[in-house]
Design a protein with these regions (language model features):
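A glycine- and small-aliphatic-rich helix-loop capping segment at beta-alpha/alpha-beta transitions
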Residues: 54-59, 120-125, 156-164, 192-200, ...
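Glycine-rich beta-strand-to-loop/alpha-helix junction loops that act as flexible
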Residues: 106-111, 180-183, 301-312
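Conserved phosphate-binding catalytic cores of ATP/NTP-utilizing and phosphoryl-transfer enzymes
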Residues: 11, 18-20, 24-32, 139-176
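Short beta-strand-loop/turn "lid" adjacent to the catalytic site in phosphate-handling enzymes
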Residues: 91-142, 151-160, 312-316
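Glycine-rich phosphate-binding loop of actin/hexokinase-like ATP-binding domains
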Residues: 163-167, 171-232, 315-316, 323-328, ...
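ATP-binding/phosphotransfer module of carbohydrate and carboxylate kinases, centering on a glycine-rich
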Residues: 1-100, 218-366
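Short coil/turn connectors at secondary-structure junctions
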Residues: 34-35, 136-138, 172-176, 185, ...
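Active-site nucleophile and cofactor-binding loops and adjacent substrate-binding regions
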Residues: 72, 119-122, 141-148, 167-171, ...
């Protein structure tokens, strides 16, 4: 799964100061305003880890002091990556902190069950106890990955997004939909408010796939041979793009020669494989239709932020595809959607910033 319903969990070391820590929040004692701590954003392909500190006077809630991106398949688990990251601090101005880090916020697709973060798209299980004990972490809090990303979008500067669909007027004040295809299909909704915004994590990627034309009906029939429930994530993800390509090769009566989502994307952009081009066209059309549905469902008048590893690579293709027409094609709601812009974010450190900012906000008295 790309992500599941909102889960917050804090694992505390057995010390009196942490006795009040429990699932559902950060607990009795978070990091002080100027106390550096670890924050990680873990996806199925990459994990991004940062050393952060609160920055109440800045445009974002935290400053990132040190940052590194890891390829998940190159490591045996998140604990090993965190140990490596802390080891890297030896060569930085923050070397003295290596033995002083007591708090960690993790944004991760999945949900917490007992000691583990459970998600089928991660290449390995994540043990909360292993992280806590291996690094001497007194407190580890887990937030859904797209929940963290949505939290961070409120701190985006104007130049940090690129238009997919522009509107004549500025977006209205209201909920912002944040979603994107990666290893899975994640989504969350930012709900503006005071004194602070709230975020609704969703299971939207698991909604049943709704074909919009005869070709998509044929594809759905092929997908249903594997299982009765076919979700949007089954098509709108890296693995989903590969499945679309395989299905279209079968419908075209041609062999499937491309073996990875990256190969399908490259062939589609180069125009060297007809089935790959059609697969990416179907992908973009389904994405536009689904995004439009979610805007209506959540009343996302504040706009849409698209994220995900594949989207920056295909942005010109996406703009030229049927994405916009499928997005607007909601009958009497077309005029409504024409007032809701869609923009692309290349999130980089945003998941780390979102997890860390949420962690600070959840401190008692924050």
């Amino acid at each position: 799964m790309g992500e599941v319903a909102k889960q917050r969990h804090a694992a505390a070391a057995p010390a009196p100061a942490e006795a009040g820590t429990a699932a559902g929040g950060v607990g009795a004692s978070g990091p002080g305003p100027q106390q550096p701590f670890l924050a990680a954003d873990v996806g199925g392909t990459h994990a991004r880890i940062g050393l952060v500190v609160g920055n109440a006077a800045g445009p974002r809630p935290v400053s990132v002091l040190h940052y590194h991106r890891y390829h998940c398949l190159d490591w045996p688990g998140l604990a090993a990556m965190l140990r490596d990251f802390v080891g890297q601090l030896a060569g930085t101005p923050h070397a003295a902190l290596r033995g002083e880090l007591r708090h960690c916020a993790v944004a991760c697709a999945g949900y917490v069950l007992d000691d583990a973060i459970v998600n089928g798209n991660l290449p390995w299980p994540v043990s909360i106890r292993e992280i806590r004990d291996g690094l001497g972490i007194g407190q580890l809090a887990v937030i859904n990955d797209f929940e963290a990303l949505a939290y961070a979008t409120q701190f985006l500067a104007a130049g940090e997004t690129r238009p997919v669909i522009d509107t004549a007027a500025a977006p209205a004040e209201g909920p912002v939909l944040v979603m994107g295809p990666g290893t899975g299909l994640g989504s969350a909704v930012l709900l503006p408010g005071r004194p602070r915004a709230q975020v609704l994590a969703t299971e939207a990627g698991q909604v049943s796939l709704a074909p919009g034309n005869e070709r998509e009906i044929e594809i759905l029939r092929l997908f249903r041979r594997e299982r009765a429930h076919v979700s949007f994530e089954d098509a709108l993800s890296g693995p989903g793009l590969l499945k679309l390509y395989a299905a279209l090769c079968e419908l075209r009566g041609s062999p499937a020669q491309l073996l990875t989502p990256a190969e399908v994307t490259a062939a589609a952009l180069a125009g060297s494989d007809g089935a790959a081009v059609e697969a990416l066209e179907v992908f973009c059309g389904l994405l536009g239709s689904f995004v439009g549905d979610l805007v209506l469902l959540y009343g996302a008048r504040g706009g849409v932020c698209l994220a995900g590893g594949i989207l920056p690579q295909i942005l010109p293709f996406l703009r030229a595809s049927t994405f916009a027409e499928r997005y607007f094609n909601k009958g009497v709601m077309r005029a409504y959607l024409q007032q809701v812009p869609v923009r692309l974010i290349e999130h980089g450190q945003l998941g780390v910033i979102g997890a860390a900012g949420w962690f600070l906000d959840e401190r008692p008295g924050a």
